[in-house]
UniProtKB/Swiss-Prot annotation:
Biological function: Converts holo-ACP to apo-ACP by hydrolytic cleavage of the phosphopantetheine prosthetic group from ACP.
Entry keyword Membrane: no
Enzyme class: hydrolase
Biological process (GO), any one: fatty acid biosynthetic process
Name of the protein: Acyl carrier protein phosphodiesterase
């Protein structure tokens, strides 16, 4: 899962959206640095990552990547799940339009920015203003996201080519998304994530 899915599941679970978004920017034990609700959100994010990576649908999807891109498949798939969520948002969350949800999420996250790591602050400088969560529905933007990640971290250069794996298996990936994501939504609503 990437930014949108973590925020969505946090909302369904009535967990800290701030903590769920912040989690990838925090190493080790967050309890000394953040308030309890944010810490709980960070832990929820970490549980979701472990759960998602071990889902049979996700393990199967990783096998569809070519040898030269399989190492970055987990990252690429996280971004792709956000694509499907953004694309099908009106079906999955009909009572909370994506644009409104994005504004709501931004308001929640802004409350912790003064005490956040600089990399997280940098992310927030463009995540909201460039409308990433809405633009995830566009595959050209997904390609741009993967290229941007590869540019910032040269050891992840294979992300550029992983776009071709997504394109080659688009329909099958979408099917897998529909197989697992509604289950995760239900688990989040029951606070079981």
């Amino acid at each position: 899962m990437n930014f949108l899915a973590h925020l969505h599941l946090a909302h369904l679970a009535e967990s800290s959206l701030s903590g769920n978004l912040l989690a990838d920017f925090v190493r080790g034990n967050p309890e000394e640095s953040f308030p309890p609700d944010v810490v709980a959100g960070i832990h929820m994010h970490r549980r979701i990552d472990v759960l998602t990576d071990n889902l049979p649908e996700v393990r199967e999807a990783r096998e569809w990547f070519r040898n030269e891109t399989r190492r970055v498949a987990p990252i690429t798939l996280d971004v792709m799940w956000d694509h499907f969520l953004s694309r099908h948002w009106s079906q999955l969350s009909p009572d909370f339009p994506l644009q409104e949800f994005t504004c709501y999420a931004r308001e929640q996250v802004m409350t912790i920015l003064p005490d956040s790591p600089q990399r997280f602050i940098n992310l927030n400088n463009y995540l909201w203003s460039e409308q990433w969560l809405v633009r995830y529905r566009d595959m050209d933007f997904i390609q741009s996201v993967l290229n941007g990640m590869a540019s910032r971290r040269p050891r992840l250069d294979a992300l550029r080519d992983s776009w071709y794996d997504l394109d080659a298996h688009y329909d099958a990936l979408e099917t897998r998304f529909w197989q697992f994501y509604p289950r995760m939504m239900e688990q989040a609503s029951r606070k079981a994530l």
